[in-house]
Amino acid sequence: MKRIAVLTSGGDAPGMNAAVRAVVRKAISEGMEVCGINRGYAGMVEGDIFPLDAKGVSNILSRGGTFLQSARYPEFAKLEGQLKGIEQLKKHGIEGVVVIGGDGSYHGAMRLTEHGFPAVGLPGTIDNDIVGTDYTIGFDTAVNTATDALDKIRDTSFSHGRTFVVEVMGRNAGDIALWSGIAAGADQIIIPEEPYDIKEVVANVKNGYLSKSKNHHLIVLAEGVMHGEEFAAQMKEAGDNSDLRVTNLGHILRGGAPTPRDRVIASWMGAHAVELLREGKGGLAIGIQNEELVEHPILGSAEDGALFSLTEQGEIVVNNPHKARLDFAALNRDLSN
């Protein structure tokens, strides 16, 4: 394989640039040429493809976001979009692709491989919701950013004797809420993976003020449960009479310089992706499990360790869907009592 390409797709995540840098420099060391694809699959279809060299990826290791930019492009799920993208890849002499992104990005990598273009997926999302890996690129940075914000919110919460509901990103996964909540000493953490009783939430707030002689209360809410304002309204309906405020950390969690951990795992995965393509291997996703690099087929059977399967109707289903660590949820309950 003489020329490969790299793209970032879906929501941006700190560490994506580190992965791109590793792909480029590892490929060059292996005597391969590398192209960057701007704006993910949209840029592939439109032919927004350009050569990359070592100088082009210098000074991006510590930058947040993705210098290749990203875009959601649902049209690539259709055969017409895939064929247009493949036409552009052939036009630029590209023989393999490294795809950095989430579930939807993996589906695109799977389709490319089916059409004869080996593609390797790297888990790039702050949500940490990709199957086949303990950690995704960007998750550690997002947790650090959220924890820093929660520490600051606790300061003002204490100063004014208030209850705060802090909504954090994560899509349908509660990992960011859980990890940052424990790190910040949250009084309650509400995540999609674990049911909650709003009356119990309110009772915990009241008990915290009364029995613990605390003058403030911090609740971390994963966006996959509901929005913060809606949750606060439920609390008021259930009898909460505290001085309640709502804060949504929003997209701040996607930005900022990646942590050393995110830089290292992104570099590790990016370099390994090149090794797989050099061997002509595609249709694989790289992950980290028990601090070791692992590879899983993107499409296949659950028994074979594949991340996704196809139903008889041709629908893509997730094998062994990701779940937040509920033992961590139990830990938080023990520590907040």
Swiss-Prot record:
Tell me the residue numbers annotated for binding ATP: 11, 72-73, 102-105
Pfam families in alphabetical order: PFK
UniProt EC number: 2.7.1.11
User: What cofactor does this chain's UniProt record say it requires?
Assistant: Mg(2+)
The record lists Mg(2+) as bound by: 103
Q: What's an example Gene Ontology biological process for this entry?
A: fructose 6-phosphate metabolic process
Pathway in which the depicted protein is active? Carbohydrate degradation; glycolysis; D-glyceraldehyde 3-phosphate and glycerone phosphate from D-glucose: step 3/4
Gene3D superfamilies registered for this protein in UniProt: 3.40.50.450, Phosphofructokinase domain
What domain of life? Bacteria
Entry's localization field: Cytoplasm
Q: What name does UniProt use for this protein?
A: ATP-dependent 6-phosphofructokinase
